[in-house]
Amino acid sequence: MRHDTTLLIVGLTVSLAASLGAQATGMPSYNAPYRAFVKSEIGAVVSFPNGDGVAFEGVYRFARGKFDLGLRGGMYAPGGGASSEVLVGAEGRQRVITHTDDFPLDGAVVVGVGTSLISDGSALFVPVGLSLGRRMGPKDSSITIVPYAQPTAVLIVNGGTHLRFTLGLGADFKLSRKFDARISAGIGDINGVSLGAVWLR
């Protein structure tokens, strides 16, 4: 029964991605199914959404049991002389799937809320996604890689209400006990690439 439920959740979430959105601040930055830190992490993310401009965000995340909460904020400077946007958001992540012999991936539900603030047209983002991946690395080593996919549905409110879908693909590289490097890309209505570096506690 548990196996059937897991497959149903995965199937429904992946089917949303077929329509092909982004995470809490509208940038193509996504989450692995589990955290790299024990207590908390702090770092920075640079994003290039839709090949149009660049965004810089500071990120902080802390743990509460199997749940962790992340806060992020920064600035997005679009190309073409458009006005800059202030980005503010929060994300929560909860592990819901543990790999088995029948299903090889771990999974976490990722939910968020955030906004991009601009004088002539702010937007609210409410993403809900399922991150699926698996930690890999040499035995007895602190170096690990977590490749993952995160199909996500996102509600966007910006004068009207829109439901969009995105598929996030990424990898987290834990290079030491204190440092993690990350890359992710969005496929869909919001394309682009994000690069991140965080320090772990």
Question: Model segments located where?
Answer:
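N-terminal, post-signal-peptide region of Sec/Tat-exported proteins
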Residues: 49-77
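Outer-membrane beta-barrel transmembrane domain signature
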Residues: 23-43, 48-52, 64, 80-81, ...
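Metabolite-binding pocket within alpha/beta catalytic cores that recognizes anionic/polar moieties
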Residues: 74-75, 87-89
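Cleavable N-terminal export/targeting peptides
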Residues: 1-37
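Active-site-adjacent beta->alpha loops and helix N-cap segments on the catalytic face
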Residues: 84
